[in-house]
Amino acid sequence: MNEPVLFLLLLLAIGVIAKNQSLIIAIAVLLAIKLFGLEARLLPAIQAKGINWGVTVITVAVLAPIATGEIGFKQLIGSLQSASAWIALLFGIFVALIAKGGVMLLASDPHITASLVLGTVIAVSLFHGVAVGPLIGAGIAYVVIKMVEYF
């Protein structure tokens, strides 16, 4: 057994112990790709474009209430009348700008990716975190909203 498979199996065990379905599914997909000998064809594309695909799926999920009619112009205009909505808007902009800096950092120092991956795996598997950047903005906005409500 080679090192990548052993590493993935270790992470799978952590995912099972932590009962983290997303981590388990992700590792199962990667192990299946390796098992069927598709890694040379699929993994470079997943590595290069996977984050963008994930953000696209999350964006579709976030926009689904617009498509179903749950959120329309009336709700949008109404929401912008609250301080919470303005905080969320500002943090959406802030996180997008921070992500730009993160992309530049990873491009200039690819070795930092290993630490990033390890930190993400630890957060996802042990602390039930979510490996999704845009949700960080919502989390920060939530904290600030609670602080504004408190004071």
Swiss-Prot record:
Superkingdom per UniProt: Bacteria
Segments passing through the bilayer: 5-25, 53-73, 86-106, 116-136
Main location group: membrane
Membrane topology: Multi-pass membrane protein
This protein's UniProt keywords: Cell membrane, Membrane, Transmembrane, Transmembrane helix
Subcellular locations according to the entry: Cell membrane
Pfam families: DUF441
GO cellular component, one term: plasma membrane
Family: Belongs to the UPF0756 family.
Listed name of the protein: UPF0756 membrane protein GTNG_2661
Organism the protein comes from: Geobacillus thermodenitrificans (strain NG80-2)
